[in-house]
Amino acid sequence: MKISLPAFEKAKVLVVGDVMLDRYWAGPTARISPEAPVPVVKVEQLEDRPGGAANVAINIATLGGSASLAGIVGVDETADALTVGVRALGVEPNWHKVADKPTITKLRVMSRNQQLLRLDFEESYSQAESDALLAQSLSELDKVDVAVLSDYAKGALISPQSFIEAANAKGVKVLVDPKGSDFSKYRGAYLLTPNMSEFEVVVGKVESEADLVAKAQGLLQAFDLTAMLVTRSEKGMTLITKDQPELHIPTVAREVYDVTGAGDTVISALATAIAAGSDLPQACAIANTAAGIVVAKLGTSTVTRLELIEALSLSHGESGFGAVSEDQLAYALEQAKLRGERVVMTNGCFDILHAGHVSYLQQARALGDRLIVAVNTDASVKRLKGEGRPVNSEDRRMTVLAALASVDWVVPFSEDTPQRIISRLLPDLLVKGGDYKVEDIAGGSEVMAAGGQVKVLGFEDGISTTAIIQNIMANQ
């Protein structure tokens, strides 16, 4: 499956559920305690990270989406730390505060990148506290396209049926990261994302692929669900829907380092992609790629859009530079822009590459960090130049251009002008050689409307492809 990332910045997602603080104490271990046969950790590093539903929200924000967050917290230092943590990552929380219970905290003691001990500080929330959280979250449904219920069975989502019904009435898709043996509480949701262990708690032991699909279909019918994505560790993911064949997506993890928060990453990537307009198979493939990235990190972590783009480029077998397709270039260009690189673009036939071309391309490249050369296809050159042109096929022209040190990407276009492809790629600077006026350069108005610049560069006098061809013909 060819995966295309949507415009994540269009995604508006509400996250409701069990929020918690993941706290890490880390340091070296060099001796055993004289008090008991346990290692002594000399703590040198303290770190707090938002976890649970809070991690889902910041994953959405890190991808570029807009996330609102609702959860239950105590009136304590941990709640303050959690608030600071989510705000620092672009998420504004809407807490339901309870005075007699602590904010859920998971304290991990780490040494040499290994977890030695985990301490949990928590008390389950009551039905009344859960109902209050869900009720205060209803007003947010008018502002979003997707809602996520992140259930860690801590009590924030005891009975979410009325919330799901309200979301459905407003056309908001509800995605659930479920917990527990009773999936009936999620009746009417759009999608559930259980892992294999959670799935088997509900349906019993899965004996085969066919058995998995059949049991998932049974849950879809029983609880009026649209789809289910079962995450299966090293076996990847399986998407089951009511009206389509199952879709198996193989794992893309390069190395499993820590699975903490992997489920949060899956549902956050799913929600962001769906809210941004991806169809369900595409969204699942994006989530699978994101999960493969996050399990290679230590602790509760997030995935950036740039990491996704780079991972997708590798999975598509793309080197990132040279002669590329338009879609490949769109990926590469987004990486460059996220790195803060200034991208220059030019275009032409470049039929017989000569010293004038080389000098011009060197000038263009000197104006930025990366240079795109859009090249007319053979059919386009023939329409513009007439019979007998091009002398060199587009493959050969692109190969020669891509070999120049000044050129980063070469991409073909089939139209008579490059206006469409320039309008799609929108470089920071569009350059054209010759005696053009800026206002007459194809694609120039679109580049300037997007905040870019347009510049005319001079060619070396007396050097042209036409003159070279005429000289060859005269000497035959």
Swiss-Prot record:
Active site positions, chain numbering: D264
Region feature Ribokinase, mapped onto this chain: 1-319
Entries under Gene3D superfamilies matching the protein: 3.40.1190.20, HUPs (3.40.50.620)
Record organism: Shewanella pealeana (strain ATCC 700345 / ANG-SQ1)
Amino acids binding ATP: N195, M196, S197, E198
Pathway where this protein functions: Nucleotide-sugar biosynthesis; ADP-L-glycero-beta-D-manno-heptose biosynthesis; ADP-L-glycero-beta-D-manno-heptose from D-glycero-beta-D-manno-heptose 7-phosphate: step 1/4; Nucleotide-sugar biosynthesis; ADP-L-glycero-beta-D-manno-heptose biosynthesis; ADP-L-glycero-beta-D-manno-heptose from D-glycero-beta-D-manno-heptose 7-phosphate: step 3/4
Annotated family: In the N-terminal section; belongs to the carbohydrate kinase PfkB family.
EC supergroup of this enzyme: transferase
Pfam families: CTP_transf_like, PfkB
PANTHER family in the cross-refs: BIFUNCTIONAL PROTEIN HLDE
EC number: 2.7.1.167, 2.7.7.70
Superkingdom of origin organism: Bacteria
The protein's role, per its UniProt record: Catalyzes the ADP transfer from ATP to D-glycero-beta-D-manno-heptose 1-phosphate, yielding ADP-D-glycero-beta-D-manno-heptose.
Record-given protein name: Bifunctional protein HldE
GO cellular component: cytosol
